[in-house]
Regions:
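Periplasmic polypeptide-binding modules associated with outer-membrane biogenesis and secretion
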Residues: 7-132, 143-145, 157-176, 303-305, ...
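C-terminal outer-membrane beta-barrel translocator/porin domains of Gram-negative envelope proteins
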Residues: 125-130, 256-260, 264-379
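C-terminal hydrophobic structural anchor segments
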Residues: 374-407
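Gram-negative/organellar outer-membrane beta-barrel architecture
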Residues: 83, 88, 94, 100-102, ...
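Transmembrane beta-barrel strands of outer-membrane/channel proteins
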Residues: 128-132, 142, 158-162, 184-190, ...
Length: 447
């Protein structure tokens, strides 16, 4: 008999059932004699809060209990909203110290015991990669991350980008979640770039920077970080063309406050979320020679925000702005000015602003307002096309900020592919400062 012989199958089943009909009838009568089942409404509700009498931690080995408490923000002998508890669990998991973070409740007199069970992650990660873009050229990327070095709850990051423009950093952080933590970071960075005047190359500038940062950090939720600290810089700038333009190494001292928040859904071709960075710093020149006449102490304020507006499953409208202002701005040190142009944001300078249609660091000043708009469309699987437009002003005097001569307008079209080695992008651009089209290529993640 085949599965397609429907009539034969039905007939055979009916004959088999009739052969044992008396037994089936007795079974049905027996069930019916029990009467109808009583209906019970399921009206139990999950409470929005619970009283925590005590807390138990299971699975902690290398991570301190203080760190986990700082992430969770739960205290015994107090009420806790379950939404707040879930936020704390997400915050702890996002730290990277744990492979899993789970919780449960045990009944207790007057409330419940909160049981936090964790599985700690690997203590170290090593990585290597390669990156190329039109601004920085090719670089070999090296990365190492170690956890719980010297102190529990600490992280040590070692990064290097070895190439034509070398960058390296060593970063040690004692992260205590929503409790104040402590960090120290050393960065070395050298960069060569053209200096432009009226669209033509005027000079080739070389810079070398050594910087040490000491700061205290507070993590708000799992996406926002507040920092207050000090920077010491040992910075050199010179000309590759003019032998008279070589100022040697000079020292700077900079207290700062910064706030950073990142809720992007992914690092490349993001479709939801917001990223914002704010920094207020006071730059003090420490060297007592020609520099005290050339550069003056400067108070620098800057804020940058980029927002994703999902329009449909495949398209996202992106909007952003950068605003930067400087007091005592006539002679601000080079590395603390606002520099505009190019597409790669991977620089040690706080005030770097990518801009369509301008060549790498083509414009610089100490007062600026810039807006950025783009429409990202996912044309097929991991392929994207993104038209972009940027507009804004940059000047050396606040009175000149909105004059026509300081207005910049750039536009471009980017073609991208989200590959396993990182974003691969080709962008063609133009602007009111360059009559010819400018191309930009990016391959892989940047450091």
């Amino acid at each position: 008999m085949s599965f397609t012989d429907y009539d034969s199958i039905i007939k055979a089943g009916e004959l088999s059932a009739r052969a044992i009909f008396p037994q089936l009838k007795r079974l049905a009568d027996s069930i019916n004699s029990l009467g109808a089942a009583e209906y019970k409404a399921n009206d139990a509700r999950i409470p929005d809060s619970i009283y925590i009498t005590s807390i138990q931690y299971i699975g902690l080995k290398n991570v301190s209990k203080n760190y986990l408490e700082g992430s969770l923000k739960v205290n015994p002998q107090s009420w806790i909203l379950l939404d707040k508890l879930n936020e704390g669990v997400i915050r702890a998991y996002a730290s990277g110290f744990f492979e899993s973070v789970d919780y449960s409740f045990l009944p207790d007199v007057g409330g419940a015991t909160l049981v936090i069970e964790v599985s700690e992650g690997d203590q170290g990660i090593l990585g290597v990669g390669i990156h190329y873009d039109s601004d920085y050229k090719v670089a070999l990327l090296l990365n190492a991350t170690f956890k719980n070095v010297v102190f529990k709850g600490s992280k040590l990051f070692i990064d290097a980008g070895l190439g034509e423009n070398t960058k390296a950093s060593v970063f040690y952080l004692i992260d205590r979640g929503m409790k104040p933590g402590f960090g120290v970071k050393y960065t070395y960075f050298n960069l060569g770039f053209n200096q432009y005047e009226d669209g033509s190359v005027k000079d080739v500038i070389k810079t070398d920077e050594n910087r040490i940062e000491l700061f205290t950090q507070l993590s708000l939720r799992h996406i926002t970080k507040f920092k207050i600290g000090l920077e010491y810089e040992y910075f050199k700038v010179k000309s590759d063309i003019s032998t008279d333009f070589d100022y040697g190494f000079n020292s700077y001292f900079t207290p700062f406050i910064s706030i950073g928040s990142d809720s992007y859904d992914r690092s490349s071709f993001s479709t939801t979320g917001t990223k914002i960075d704010f920094k207020l710093k006071y730059v003090v020149a420490l060297s007592h020679d020609w520099m005290t006449d050339l550069f003056q102490n400067s108070l620098v304020f800057q804020i940058k925000q980029n927002i994703n507006f999902p329009v449909s499953k495949k398209s996202t409208f992106k909007a952003g702005y950068f605003a930067g202002f400087t007091l005592q701005s006539a002679n601000t040190p080079y590395q603390h000015q606002f520099i505009v142009g190019g597409q790669n944001n991977n620089t040690s300078f706080d005030g770097f602003i990518s801009f369509n249609g301008l060549r790498f660091i083509e414009k610089r000043g100490v007062q600026t307002i810039i807006t950025k708009f783009a429409w990202q469309y996912n044309i097929y699987k991991a392929f994207y096309i993104t038209p972009k437009i940027d507009a804004g002003f940059i000047a050396n005097d606040i009175a000149d900020l909105f004059t026509p001569k300081d207005f910049m307008l750039g536009y471009g079209m980017a073609f991208g592919y989200n590959s396993f080695i990182g974003p691969i992008e080709f962008t063609v651009m133009g602007s009111n400062y360059n009559s010819n089209a400018i191309g930009f290529i990016n391959i892989g993640y940047s450091f």
